[in-house]
C-alpha cells in the first residue's frame, strides 16, 4: 500500500510536514438542520426541574448536534464518491463534493489511484475522521463554543465559588470510557478551564504523577500566589468519577472493572486514599488533600455522590442519588430545592461534613439536574447508545477540546509501554465498533507542550513519532492491513491556538531512486 508510512518515528529530524492537504478549509460544510439534529429532540420544550438551565441546555445541544453531525456525514459521503470513482473527472468532482459537504480536501494521492485500483475507503474514512476532529479543535480554541475558557465569565465565577468552598484547585479523573468524556462540561456543568482533567481506564489515575501536579500547584501558590496565596486556608480537591449502567449493569458498566459497580467504586476510593497518604507521608506541617468519589450513570447522566465526612471518611455502599433528589424536589421552588439538597447531603455523611464540601456537592447535584433534563428531553428517555459509539481514540497528553459523550476514547500516556492497559481497552472497543465493519481505527496522537520552555516543541514532536512507532509495532497486524491509522498533533498549552499537525500514517511513501 503506497500510502502506508510505518516508520514515522525514524524521521524526527525533518520538519515532519505531511504532504497530504493540511490547510484549514475556507468552506464550511453544509450540514442541514435535519442532519445536525438527527436523534435529538428539542430540549427547549417540555417540563423541566425548577433548577434546570433551559438556555444552557439549548446551547449545549446545538454544539453537540453540530459536532456529531459532522462525523455522521462521513460514511454517506464516502458511499457517494465510491460510486463515482470511474468517472472521467473523478478527482475534481470528488474534491468539489468534499469541500462543499465536509469542508475540507481529501488526499490527492489516494484519489489519483482510482483509475488503476479500487479507492482505499479505509484510508479515506480515517482521513475524514481526522479532518473532522481538526474542525472541532479549531472551532473550540478559536471560538470557545462552550463558553468555559480561561478568562470567561463562567470560569471566573466558578473559581470564586471554589475558593469560597475552601478549595484552590479541582482535579478530576474520570474513566477513559468515551461515555464520560462530557463529564465536566455537561454532566457536572463546570467550566472546562476551571478543572484539571486526566482520564484513565477505570478512573485509576497515576498516583505519582498526581502528587507531582500537587507539588507544582502548591509551589506556584507559594511563588506566584496563583490561584491563591500559600497561606490561604484552602485545599487541593481530587475527584474520581467512576461509572455504571442503571439499565444493563452486568454488561454496560466499566470494562476495566468487569462491569462491577462496587469494584469500580472501591478501586476509585483506594486510589484516592493512596494519593492522600502519599502527600501526607512526603510532606510535613499537615500537608493533605480533600477527596471526593462520584459515580455517573452512563444511561441517564445522573450522578451519585459518596459524601465524605470532614475527616475524609466515606461509606462505599452509601451515596446520594441525583436522580432521586431530582424527583424529590420536582414540585418545589428553586430555593426550596436547594435547601432540600443541602439537608440530604449533610444527613447522609458518615460524620459531620465540611461546610465547604457540602456547598460544593450541592452545586454539583443542582447542576446535574440540568443534565438529567437534557438527556430526557434530547432522547425522550435514556441515551439510545447505551454502549460505546466513540469516533476515534485520543492518545497522549492533551485533548482539552474534547467534551462530548461518546466522541473519544482517551488513553492518556507518555509511553505505550506504560499506558498499554488503557490503549488495549480502546483498541478492543474499536474492534467492535469499526473493524467488525471493515473500517479502520482512527488514532489521534497529541502531545501538549509549554512554548515557554526551550526545546519543548521539538520534544513533543519526537514524543508523537515515538508513540506512533510503538502503536504500529504493538498493533502491527491492524496497522499493516490499513485497519489502524494515526494522526499526529502537538499544541502549545500556553496559548489559545489550536493544535498543529506534524504527521500521519496517511502520508504517501516516496520510492527511493536506484
Curated annotation (Swiss-Prot):
Q: Does the keyword Lipid biosynthesis apply?
A: no
Its EC number is: 4.2.1.1
Cofactors: Zn(2+)
Similarity annotation:
Belongs to the beta-class carbonic anhydrase family. CsoSCA subfamily.
Primary localisation category = other
Query: How does the record describe its quaternary structure?
Result: Homodimer.
| GO BP annotation list | carbon fixation; photosynthesis
Provide the organism lineage as a comma list.
Bacteria, Bacillati, Cyanobacteriota, Cyanophyceae, Synechococcales
Q: What class of enzyme is it?
A: lyase
Report the active site residues.
177
Q: Which GO terms describe its cellular component?
A: carboxysome
What is the catalytic activity of this protein? hydrogencarbonate + H(+) = CO2 + H2O
- What keywords were assigned to this record? Bacterial microcompartment, Carbon dioxide fixation, Carboxysome, Lyase, Metal-binding, Photosynthesis, Zinc
Q: Which InterPro entries match?
A: Carboxysome_shell_carb_anhy, CsoSCA_C, CsoSCA_C_sf, CsoSCA_cat, CsoSCA_N, CsoSCA_N_sf
Region annotation (Disordered) maps to: 1-27
List localization entries.
Answer: Carboxysome
| Entry keyword annotation includes Secreted | no
- Which residues bind Zn(2+) per the record? 175, 243, 254
The lineage's top-level taxon is Bacteria
User: What role is this protein assigned?
Assistant: Reversible hydration of carbon dioxide. Essential for photosynthetic carbon dioxide fixation, supplies CO(2) to RuBisCO (ribulose bisphosphate carboxylase, cbbL-cbbS) in the carboxysome.
Cofactor remark from the record: Binds 1 Zn(2+) per monomer.
Matching NCBIfam families, A to Z? shell_carb_anhy
Q: Name one GO molecular function term.
A: carbonate dehydratase activity
Entry protein name: Carboxysome shell carbonic anhydrase
Amino acid at each position: 500500500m503506497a500510502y502506508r508510512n510505518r516508520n514515522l518515528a525514524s524521521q524526527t529530524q525533518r520538519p515532519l510536514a505531511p504532504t497530504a492537504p493540511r490547510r484549514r478549509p475556507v468552506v464550511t460544510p453544509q450540514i442541514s438542520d435535519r442532519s445536525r439534529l438527527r436523534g435529538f429532540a428539542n430540549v427547549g420544550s417540555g417540563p423541566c426541574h425548577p433548577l434546570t438551565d433551559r438556555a444552557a441546555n439549548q446551547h449545549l445541544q446545538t454544539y453537540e448536534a453540530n459536532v456529531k453531525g459532522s462525523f455522521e456525514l462521513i460514511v454517506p459521503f464516502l458511499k457517494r464518491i465510491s460510486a463515482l470513482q470511474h468517472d472521467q473527472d473523478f478527482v475534481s468532482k470528488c474534491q468539489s463534493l468534499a469541500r462543499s459537504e465536509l469542508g475540507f480536501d481529501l488526499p490527492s494521492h489516494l484519489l489519483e489511484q482510482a483509475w488503476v485500483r479500487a479507492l482505499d475507503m479505509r484510508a479515506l474514512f480515517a482521513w475524514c475522521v481526522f479532518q473532522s476532529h481538526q474542525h472541532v479543535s479549531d472551532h473550540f480554541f478559536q471560538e470557545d463554543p462552550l463558553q468555559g475558557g480561561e478568562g470567561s465569565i463562567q470560569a471566573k465565577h466558578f473559581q470564586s465559588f471554589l475558593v469560597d468552598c475552601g478549595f484552590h484547585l479541582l482535579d478530576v479523573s474520570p474513566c477513559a470510557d468515551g461515555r464520560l468524556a462530557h463529564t465536566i462540561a455537561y454532566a457536572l456543568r463546570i467550566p472546562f478551564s476551571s478543572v484539571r482533567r486526566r482520564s484513565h481506564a477505570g478512573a485509576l489515575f497515576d498516583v505519582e504523577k498526581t502528587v507531582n501536579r500537587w507539588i507544582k500547584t502548591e509551589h506556584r501558590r507559594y511563588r506566584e500566589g496563583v490561584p491563591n496565596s500559600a497561606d490561604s486556608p484552602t485545599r487541593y480537591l481530587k475527584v474520581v468519577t467512576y461509572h455504571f449502567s442503571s439499565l444493563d449493569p452486568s454488561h454496560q458498566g466499566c470494562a476495566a472493572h468487569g462491569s462491577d459497580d462496587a469494584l469500580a467504586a472501591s478501586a476509585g476510593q483506594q486510589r484516592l486514599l493512596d494519593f492522600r497518604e502519599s502527600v501526607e507521608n512526603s510532606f510535613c506541617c499537615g500537608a493533605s488533600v480533600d477527596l471526593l468519589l462520584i459515580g455517573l450513570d452512563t444511561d441517564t447522566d445522573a450522578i451519585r455522590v459518596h459524601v465524605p465526612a470532614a475527616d475524609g471518611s466515606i461509606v462505599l455502599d452509601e451515596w446520594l442519588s441525583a436522580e432521586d433528589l431530582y424527583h424529590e424536589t420536582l414540585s418545589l421552588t428553586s430555593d426550596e430545592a436547594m435547601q432540600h439538597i443541602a439537608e440530604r447531603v449533610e444527613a447522609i455523611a458518615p460524620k459531620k461534613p465540611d461546610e465547604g464540601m457540602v456547598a460544593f456537592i450541592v452545586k454539583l447535584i443542582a447542576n446535574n439536574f440540568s443534565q438529567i433534563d437534557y438527556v430526557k428531553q434530547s432522547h425522550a428517555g435514556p441515551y439510545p447508545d447505551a454502549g460505546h459509539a466513540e469516533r476515534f481514540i485520543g492518545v497522549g497528553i492533551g485533548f482539552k477540546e474534547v467534551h462530548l459523550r461518546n466522541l473519544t476514547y482517551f488513553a492518556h500516556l507518555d509511553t505505550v509501554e506504560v499506558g498499554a492497559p488503557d490503549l488495549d481497552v480502546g483498541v478492543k472497543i474499536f474492534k467492535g465498533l469499526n473493524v467488525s465493519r471493515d473500517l479502520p481505527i482512527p488514532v489521534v496522537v497529541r502531545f501538549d507542550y509549554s512554548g515557554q520552555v526551550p526545546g519543548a516543541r521539538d520534544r513533543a514532536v519526537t514524543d508523537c513519532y515515538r508513540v506512533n512507532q510503538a502503536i504500529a509495532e504493538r498493533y502491527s497486524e491492524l496497522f499493516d492491513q490499513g485497519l489502524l491509522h494515526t494522526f499526529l498533533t502537538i499544541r502549545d498549552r500556553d496559548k489559545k491556538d489550536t493544535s498543529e499537525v506534524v504527521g500521519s500514517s496517511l502520508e504517501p511513501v516516496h520510492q527511493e531512486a536506484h
